Amino acid sequence: MLALDPKNITKIDFINNPGVRYGDGIAYVVDIITHRKESGYTVGTDLTSALTTLQGDGMVYGKWNRGKSEWSLSYDLSGYRTKGSKSKQSAEYTLTDGSIHRIERNDMETLRKAIAHEAKLTYNWADSTATVFQTSFSGAFNNAPDNYIIKDIKDGARQYQATSCDADKSYSPALDVYFFRQISPRQSLTANAVGTYISTQTGSFYNEGSPYKYNVDGKTTSLLAEAIYENRLKPFTFSTGVNYSYKYIKNGYLGDASSLTKTNNNRLYGFAEIKGMLRQLRYTLGAGVSYIHYTQNGHRFNFWTFHPKASLTYQINNGLQMSYTYQMQDKVSRIAMTSDVMIRTNSMEWTKGNPDLKPSHDMEHRLQFSYNNNRLQAFVDGYFKQCFKPNMAHYERTQDNQFVYTQINQKEIDALSVMAYAGYWLLPEKLQIAANGGLYRCFNYSNDYTHCYTSWFYAASITAYLGRFTLQGYVDNGNRFLEGESKSYNGAYSVVKASHAWRNWQFSLSWANPLNNNYKAYENELLNRNLYKHTIGYSKWMGNLVSLNISWRLSRGSKHNSAEKRINLRDTDNGIIK
């Protein structure tokens, strides 16, 4: 009775002498007749704003359904404006005569700002969960105007100021069509296709040594499509599918960098797999083949890759299990690095694309032991990855002492990760602590260098559930790795957060990197034999960052039974080298 909405009641009958249809021993019946709602709606918003800097993200959305159809519309706005990010860099260049030339670059003043808009209109038709058809049209607009960095340059005995300016503007409409059909209780078909257009205009200026300015007018068109058939047979489940992607890029570089890049990239991938269970053993066995056809300004290649995959999970007892996964796949280079353009980075360095880059073969192994009971969740995980003929950093020193960075296919990159995790409920469903840690080992085998590096990582958290309140704390020591000739560190992170739920509202307040007014965001070392660089980046706005999140949701009427989308395709790469 308490769950009834009085607005839905059409008539109430009081039956004083009910018949046998209501059962024996029934003295009277109250018959409440309601009308079924054929439509409904949902509206909501999700807003996040930094209270210590100009940064925010906000979304509003609405859904309306009637019968088997639902329309939804959402709009997202995000942006930032910061002045607190600065870096300092020391560089040592070994010249052709064997002497060393030193340059220091220190940021004196910076301004970074950007704004992004995205709107999305979606129509969904669902016949319970047997058939789902969904189509959506979205548009994104991004603008980052008039950003600049003023640097103090110490070039040998010479000291001066240099200014770097850049601007970036893009818009991107996309059409997404999704279909799911439960053909029979055991068979299903899923398909998804996404078409995207990206238009980008960028401008860059830097006057270290001498003025250097260029603009880029970029146009990108892509089609991503995938279809999967699944049949749940008695001994196992069989699935097969095909994935196709096409991307056309036309980027025109004007000014001091002059080039017209036209790229066509086609990739076709087909696979089949079975998964099932034999007593305590769950298994997945499959294989696929991919074919890549690539052309750019007279450069072309065809590339085939075999994709075997195996996954085994053995339940040792009620709480302990062991799993192993193996797979091989292709790894395509970032599209921007396959262009034939050459861009000046500073007075001594250039970045050059390589149209002859080919994909690599990646082989992955993962072994895991896990244990779970009512209060403890723990696992030990080992991961090893081998990249054969990967795209690796290559530096060339010219006769006039210019240093050119590019990528070429070289010998091998390997990565080893070993980690352990444990989460424990100190008070069941009330207070939980968790921690993980391990090591990460990188191996880089180039044609003319070998670099290896070992790093350690850890993270810990504590969460308290106090009715409608939730309190959280998290800390880690950052991320360290070495790829090619670049050793990098992403800053340590810590945050405390409190959240509260009240009716249709959710509130949360977070404090990131507390008591740190000059947060170290990153550090990078370049280890080339002829070029050593050490760069450290600091961010004032990321230290002592206080953010407030408010979300609200209201639903009325009938709810639309739409199945979860099983395939999600998306393209955002404009292929512009920077």
Where are these regions (language model features)?
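C-terminal beta-barrel architecture of Gram-negative outer-membrane proteins
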Residues: 61, 437-444, 455-501, 505-506, ...
